[in-house]
Amino acid sequence: MSKRHFDMICQRHLPLIADRIIGLSLSEHEETPKQINLFYSYLLSFNKFIQLRSLSINGVRSYKILVKITDECHHLYNLTHLNFYNCSLEDNQADFPLLVNNIWSFSKLVHCNFSIDIKGKKFFPIPKKISSSLERLSIYGSTLKLHEINRLFEYTNRLKSLSINVEFDDDNNNYILSLFPTLIELHISCSHQLDISKMISLLQNTPNLRRLNVSLWFNFLDGHQWEQIICNYLPKLKIFRLGMEETLSFDQNIEERVDELINSFRSSFWIDEHQWFVRCIIQKKTIHLYTTSKIFYNYDSVLFGSIRSTDPQDNQQKFYNNMTSIVNETFFDQPIPSYIRLPNIEYLWIKLPINDQFWSIVPSLNRLNSLTVVSYIDTFQSQLKTLLNRAPCLRRLCITQDAPLHSQMLLFRYANPSVRQLDLRDYNHYFNKEECIRLSHSSLGRQCEVLSIMINNRESIIYFIKKMINLRSLNIRCEDEKYYKGLALAKNGNNKYPDEKIQNKDDLIQWLKDHLPSTCLIVRNPHWINYILIWI
């Protein structure tokens, strides 16, 4: 969304319909920086959204904003769904329990996704207020100690669904887990070596569990162990999704270990009674085992021929039909059997020149949404042109190169009518004024909505905004500014946000505010201080 449209919605429409809106989502990222602050500048608070049932907040980096939002939610008496996604706070003085207690005090809240990461605070604080309504809770970015699960349920006594990262090996052994009879769905993950008996003690207290999703890194339970756990403690379980990984030492035989694991999941319990099939994937000395109903994300590191399954209908082609992302640009450099096809690629990183076998393996790019071309040089222009011509749904094009080219002229000749995002920040070149003009008038430039680029003259920013009529967001690095170097020194590797006096010396920001329309929002990129974000 452009800032012009967002301004219009906030100024003209929201005041008239605020009392009828039932769902609202606000997000702060590179394309919409400071969106929530801007929202508050127009509407001051959420108090007018009296019918609001669902509120989603994404990417907030301000503790004060989060406290303000959770305070105002007390007045939203119909709010049942609250989602905080990808919120990251560098302020280690932030009062984590205050945020949690605010949320637990909402009278009708049923569903909460809590993804708030506060620097230096690993563990989720147990609330001190009782929620009589919360039934579904997902916690990301922080960990829950096993011995505190009792207390979580004491303050969330209607909880039916829970998704958490658990630390099973905490030091407190002087506790007995209570029964959790309300719980019917559980998603647990553990990213360290665990005491298996403690995980079993959790599961044996969930007698009404119907859905279980388990992710274990550095831990393995074989099929016999899982069968015993389910039969003894989870009589009502209907859906079971499992993901585990184990890294072997160099003197261990990985093929024998895989055979042992696969065979342990071949009993009638797995195959006949439940039809819960598992798949084993070998990556060097690491074994990934997961139920075929669970998504495995590290596709592009998988060597062909290293897949085993208990499903008689499973095969390598079925596995690769589900592959939608390749972010390893050397993926096609490995030997690939000629019968393998990858028909559903949506996100692709590829290094030029394209391997000879690429087009036989990838027969169609009709679903390709994002393309990153690595080591681009003019010699391979025809290959890039072919990629673009065969990708009718491509939205994002990113071009990276290690060494600068003598000329950028060929870049301006490429075309694809569906591309709306152009990322040249790793192009290893500062575009001069003439090149920026050519880019603005090129086919890709005219249709571009989101542009990331390095330039050597700040005047080109003005030209981009005037001439690229569809542009709504700029992520730009300017060679003729020195502010970010001083800013990096001011941070000294410790503080994420600079001293206010340093911020006030940001000459380029001030220059842009003086020369661009006042409707543009101009800020430093919080993730890359040498880039400036302009929301148009």
Q: Where are the regions that the model predicts?
A:
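Eukaryote-biased activation of long, low-complexity terminal tails and linkers
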Residues: 1-536
